[in-house]
Amino acid sequence: MSAPPSGPAPDAQGGAPGQPTGPPGAPPNTTSNRRLQQTQAQVEEVVDIIRVNVDKVLERDQKLSELDDRADALQAGASQFESSAAKLKRKYWWKNCKMMIMLGGIGAIIVIVIIIYFFT
C-alpha cells in the first residue's frame, strides 16, 4: 500500500502547494485589495465627516462668541437704562413735590385771603 499524498489535493483551493489560497478563479490578493480599498474609502469618509464636524464646531464657537459679545453689550445698555430711568424718576418726583408745595401755598393764600375778606 502506498502512503496518502502529503500535500493538498490538486482540486482543493489554491492548487499546488506554495501558491496563495483564494476563491477559485480569483487572482491572488484581489479580495484583500478590495477590502483594503473599502476600508480606505470608509476612513476617507470618516475623515471628511470629522472635517465637516470640526468646521461646524469652529463656526458654532464663533457664533457663540459673537452672541456673548452682544449679550454683554445688551447687559451694559440695560444697566445704563436702569440708572438713567432711576435718575429721571427722582427728577420728576422732586418736580411733582415742588408742584404740590406750590399748589398748597397757593391754596393756603386763597384760604387766608377768603378768611381775611369775610372776617374784616
UniProtKB/Swiss-Prot annotation:
Give any single GO term for biological process: vesicle-mediated transport
Q: Where are the transmembrane segments?
A: 99-118
Q: Where is the composition biased (Polar residues)?
A: 29-38
Q: Which InterPro entries match?
A: Synaptobrevin-like, Synaptobrevin/VAMP, V_SNARE_CC
Which Pfam families does the record cross-reference, listed alphabetically?
Synaptobrevin (PF00957)
Q: Does the keyword Transmembrane apply?
A: yes
Q: In which tissues is it expressed?
A: Nervous system specific.
Name the SUPFAM superfamilies on file: SNARE fusion complex
Keywords recorded for this protein, A-Z = Coiled coil, Cytoplasmic vesicle, Membrane, Synapse, Synaptosome, Transmembrane, Transmembrane helix
- Please report the stretch or stretches of sequence annotated as the v-SNARE coiled-coil homology domain: 35-95
Q: What's a single GO CC term here?
A: neuron projection
* Cytoplasmic membrane side: 1-98
Tell me what topology the record assigns in the membrane: Single-pass type IV membrane protein
Instruction: Cite the ranges annotated as topological domain Vesicular.
Output: 119-120
Where in the cell? Answer: Cytoplasmic vesicle, Secretory vesicle, Synaptic vesicle membrane; Synapse, Synaptosome
> What is its biological role?
This protein may play a role in packaging, transport or release of neurotransmitters.
Record-stated family: Belongs to the synaptobrevin family.
Q: What is this protein called?
A: Synaptobrevin
Q: Which organism is it from?
A: Tetronarce californica (Pacific electric ray)
